[in-house]
């Protein structure tokens, strides 16, 4: 099969050569460079194609799409040709973190990766936005085919869009081992039911090829995250106006009410609809906390997951017990999630006032959460011994608010 003709500056020869099936050959028909063709060899054969005097005129070999070539007819047209850049073509690029590195003539500088959302996968894209909330993607694992991040590994999401995982595709594992993990693909892979397509790299794919395990890359997204949660109603007015989004207040509509929910919830849907309803609550319902994730990875994960902080900006907990005489407030365990809460950061001879504690597997009632309003050197706020008490964080604002809550009340929490 021949494609052409175009004019070239090549010189023809009159030698006969043996060609294999799927060789791609440059031919100068009629021994003239005025009629230069590309020939696809469909079978092994011997012929004179007046090829240039180099490698029998063979410039490539077909490795994919052979069936498409066999289907082509004389009346078909090829309207566009684009290169597919493989990782091996850029793997030797220089990856530097030293900002004093001198650039030379001809150097190209790539500083971030831009990812465009798949608008049919709003939940998966929001999951990704939570992973990169500090603007970076940390590489927990890398292979020839992809890089991966484990920040929200274990957080289950429903199946959304299943497509071929092309080079530059960003996916979320929705089931099986590694559920909640996010991947960015360096090479093409087939689509599988366990991977939702979050979006695609639109700029900076060169960084994807050079980044190594335990390094970070800066990420920008289209659209950027849209969230009013934890803002006041007044601040949300200003924020949304700048984005060209219509704002409707709900719940407590006062200017200083704190937003704890928004509808639509997901960035992709808000960007599409250009309108947003926000639910406000009194500032008195709010508590700010600091969590010790490095010292209590399992317990902090548990707390964030059951409160909603794992994939949201504001979490909430329902008060199970509020014992004013003992200066204690407690929140009930979620048994399904509490399995495996091993002892981590234990109290040092006493539990300090306002420390957030979770009961661990050294006791029967695993996963209960408690806070004392005053120091205690005997028991944790869940009533357990110190050996069964993990200190996972502390309250940093809203102390009086917390004291006022009663059994059945909802406490809204935000990390500082």
What are these regions (language model features)?
Residues 1-416:
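Cyclophilin-like peptidyl-prolyl cis-trans isomerases
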């Amino acid at each position: 099969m021949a494609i052409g003709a175009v004019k070239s500056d090549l010189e023809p020869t009159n030698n006969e050569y043996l060609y294999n099936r799927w060789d791609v050959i440059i031919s100068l028909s009629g021994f003239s460079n005025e009629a230069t063709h590309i020939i696809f060899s469909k079978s092994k054969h011997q012929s004179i194609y007046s090829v240039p005097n180099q490698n029998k005129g063979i410039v490539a070999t077909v490795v994919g799409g052979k069936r498409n070539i066999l289907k082509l007819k004389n009346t078909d047209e090829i309207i566009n040709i684009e290169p597919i850049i493989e990782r091996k073509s850029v793997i030797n690029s220089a990856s530097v973190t030293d900002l004093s590195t001198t650039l030379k003539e001809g150097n190209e500088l790539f500083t971030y990766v831009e990812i465009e959302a798949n608008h049919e996968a709003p939940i998966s894209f929001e999951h990704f936005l939570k992973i990169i909330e500090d603007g970076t993607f940390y590489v927990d694992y890398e292979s020839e085919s992809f890089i991966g991040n484990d920040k929200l590994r274990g957080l289950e999401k429903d199946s959304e869009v299943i497509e071929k995982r092309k080079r530059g595709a960003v996916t979320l594992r929705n089931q099986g081992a590694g559920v909640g993990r996010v991947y960015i693909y360096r090479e093409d892979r087939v689509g599988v039911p366990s991977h939702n397509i979050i979006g695609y790299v639109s700029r900076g794919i060169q960084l994807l090829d050079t980044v190594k395990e335990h390094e970070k890359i800066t990420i920008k997204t289209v659209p950027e995250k849209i969230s009013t949660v934890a803002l006041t109603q007044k601040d949300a007015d200003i924020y949304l106006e700048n984005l060209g989004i219509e704002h409707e207040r709900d719940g407590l509509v006062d200017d200083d009410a704190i937003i704890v929910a928004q509808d639509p919830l997901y960035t992709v849907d808000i960007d599409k609809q250009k309108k947003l309803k926000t639910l406000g609550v009194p500032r008195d319902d709010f508590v700010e906390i600091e969590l010790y994730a490095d010292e209590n990875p399992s317990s902090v994960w548990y707390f964030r997951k059951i409160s909603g902080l794992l994939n949201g900006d504001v979490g909430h907990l329902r008060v199970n017990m509020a014992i004013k005489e003992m200066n204690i407030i407690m929140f009930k365990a979620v048994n399904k999630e509490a399995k495996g809460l091993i002892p981590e950061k234990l109290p040092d001879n006493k539990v300090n006032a306002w420390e957030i504690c979770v009961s661990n597997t050294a006791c029967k009632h695993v996963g209960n959460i408690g806070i004392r309003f005053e120091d205690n050197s005997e028991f944790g706020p869940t009533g357990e011994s110190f050996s069964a008490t993990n200190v996972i964080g502390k309250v940093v604002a809203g102390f009086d608010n917390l004291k006022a809550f009663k059994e059945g009340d909802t406490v809204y929490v935000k990390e500082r």
